């Protein structure tokens, strides 16, 4: 149970591993020869997820892969597993494709944990503690074995809402500072 808590909630938080509740999935590999830099469906890589894409795939390839292979549902949490590890983005449901094992998503049925709460939980993990090597990578088993605690859904919603408001406020303040 956290030290700071909304007064209307009580009781213990449940403890588990992320893999007890969710699965870790990724898109089918896209070859460089299947991309272009001008038009089509955005193809996000670890350096572009959450911002502007610099590569695209054909609509036909996208439609084919979306039907045949794993593809995220709107609201699911995506996470970068190489390069800048641990960057989390909530999938907005727009047509896009993602770089295979470098970007994975948490296939979360939301029965026990909301995607909003999961986003904030995963965003706060210090992924540098995973490896003793210089090059850090998050493996699927690292995510599945991640120990976590979570409250009832009502409390998750309230926590997620508050943290989202704080994130928005911080982003606004950072923008103001940048514009000075």
Name each model-derived stretch.
Residues 19-22, 32-63, 73:
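DNA target-recognition patches
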Residues 3-28, 51:
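Non-catalytic DNA-recognition/assembly elements of restriction-modification systems
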Residues 45-46, 56, 62-123, 139:
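A short beta-sheet element
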Residues 32, 81, 97-104, 132-154:
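A short glycine-rich beta-alpha junction/loop motif
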Residues 1-14, 142-147, 151-180:
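Amphipathic alpha-helical segments with low aromatic content
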Residues 4, 16-19, 47, 101, ...:
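Structural detector for helix-capping/boundary residues
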């Amino acid at each position: 149970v956290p030290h700071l808590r909304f007064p209307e909630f009580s009781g213990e938080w449940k403890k588990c591993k992320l893999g007890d509740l969710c699965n870790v999935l990724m898109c089918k590999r896209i070859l460089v020869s299947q991309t272009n830099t001008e038009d089509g469906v955005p193809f996000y890589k670890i350096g572009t997820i959450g911002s502007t894409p610099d590569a695209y795939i054909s609509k036909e390839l996208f439609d084919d892969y979306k039907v045949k292979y794993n593809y995220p549902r709107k609201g699911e949490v995506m996470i970068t597993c190489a390069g800048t590890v641990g960057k989390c983005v909530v999938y907005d449901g727009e047509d896009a494709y993602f770089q295979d094992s470098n970007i994975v998503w948490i296939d979360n049925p939301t029965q026990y944990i909301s995607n909003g709460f999961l986003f904030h939980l995963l965003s706060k993990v210090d992924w540098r503690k995973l490896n003793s090597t210089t090059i850090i990578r998050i493996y699927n088993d690292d995510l599945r074995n991640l120990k976590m605690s979570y409250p009832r859904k009502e409390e998750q919603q309230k926590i997620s809402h508050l943290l989202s408001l704080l994130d928005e406020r911080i982003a606004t303040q950072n923008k103001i500072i940048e514009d000075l």
